[in-house]
C-alpha cells in the first residue's frame, strides 16, 4: 500500500511540474499564433493606459498569455517584438483581445502593415516579450476614488512587466492584489507617504516612495513621478 501511495504521489508531482506554466515557460519564450488588426485600443482600453499617442504601434493580447504565471494583467503595459511574413516590429500592450486564442494578438493597423499585408486580414506570427524601448523612471497612476482607506495604483513606464507590488506598513511588506484593469489594490494604507516595492517578471525588485494618498475618496485620477526603474 505504501508503495502504491508513493507512486501515486510521485505521478501527481510529476504532472504538476510538467504542466505548470511557471515551470515550463520562461517569460521571454517565443510564442506562435496569429494576428488580426483593429483601430481600437488607443483610448478606453482594458488596461487603462490612456492617453496613448495616436501613431503608436499597439496591440491587444489574448487572455491566456496576458495572465502570465497566474497574475492578472501580467503583460499589460509591456512591449512585444512581433514577427510576421514581411518583417518585425515592436508593439505596446494596451488592451485585451477577449476572443483571441493563445498566441493571438490584435494589432493596430500601422503595426500590422509593417509585418503583413492588410488585405490578408489575418496572418501567422511569432512574438516574445522584450525590454521596453523607454527612458526615465516609473510613473504611478492613482485611480479615481483612491484614498488612504482604499487605493488602486498603476505602474507605468516600466522596462519589464510588473508582477507584484507591495507597500510597507508597521515594518511589514503587504501584498497588493493586481486587478484585471492593471492596477494594484489594497485597503488601509496609512496616513503618510507610501513606501512601495515592485517585482518584475524576471524577479528583479526595486523600492520607491509615493506621496501620501488623499484623505477622502473623492479625487479624480492623477499621476505622480517615480524615482526608480527596473535594472537592465
Curated annotation (Swiss-Prot):
| Cysteine pairs bridged by disulfides in the record | none
Q: Which gene encodes it?
A: yoaJ
Please give the organism: Bacillus subtilis (strain 168)
Q: Which UniProt keywords apply?
A: Cell wall, Secreted, Signal
| Keyword Coiled coil in annotation | no
One GO location term (cellular component):
extracellular region
Q: Which residues form the signal peptide?
A: 1-25
What's the name of the protein? Expansin-YoaJ
Entry-linked Gene3D superfamilies: Expansin, cellulose-binding-like domain, RlpA-like domain
Amino acid at each position: 500500500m505504501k508503495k502504491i501511495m508513493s507512486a501515486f504521489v510521485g505521478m501527481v508531482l510529476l504532472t504538476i511540474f510538467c504542466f505548470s506554466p511557471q515551470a515550463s515557460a520562461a517569460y521571454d519564450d517565443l510564442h506562435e499564433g496569429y494576428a488580426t488588426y483593429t483601430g481600437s485600443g488607443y483610448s478606453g482600453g482594458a488596461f487603462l493606459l490612456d492617453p496613448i499617442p495616436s501613431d503608436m504601434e499597439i496591440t491587444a493580447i489574448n487572455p491566456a498569455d496576458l495572465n502570465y504565471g497566474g497574475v492578472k494583467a501580467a503583460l499589460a503595459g509591456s512591449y512585444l517584438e512581433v514577427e510576421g511574413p514581411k518583417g518585425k516590429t515592436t508593439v505596446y500592450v494596451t488592451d485585451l483581445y477577449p476572443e483571441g486564442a493563445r498566441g493571438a494578438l490584435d494589432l493596430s493597423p500601422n503595426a500590422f502593415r509593417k509585418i503583413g499585408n492588410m488585405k490578408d486580414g489575418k496572418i501567422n506570427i511569432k512574438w516574445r516579450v522584450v525590454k521596453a524601448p523607454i527612458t526615465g523612471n516609473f510613473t504611478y497612476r492613482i485611480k479615481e476614488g483612491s484614498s488612504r482607506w482604499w487605493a488602486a495604483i498603476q505602474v507605468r513606464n516600466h522596462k519589464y512587466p510588473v508582477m507584484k507590488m507591495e507597500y510597507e506598513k508597521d515594518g511589514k511588506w503587504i501584498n497588493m492584489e493586481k486587478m484585471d484593469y492593471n492596477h494594484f489594490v489594497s485597503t488601509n494604507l496609512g496616513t503618510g507617504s507610501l513606501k512601495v516595492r515592485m517585482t518584475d517578471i524576471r524577479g528583479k525588485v526595486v523600492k520607491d516612495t509615493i506621496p501620501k494618498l488623499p484623505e477622502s475618496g473623492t479625487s479624480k485620477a492623477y499621476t505622480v513621478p517615480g524615482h526608480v526603474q527596473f535594472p537592465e
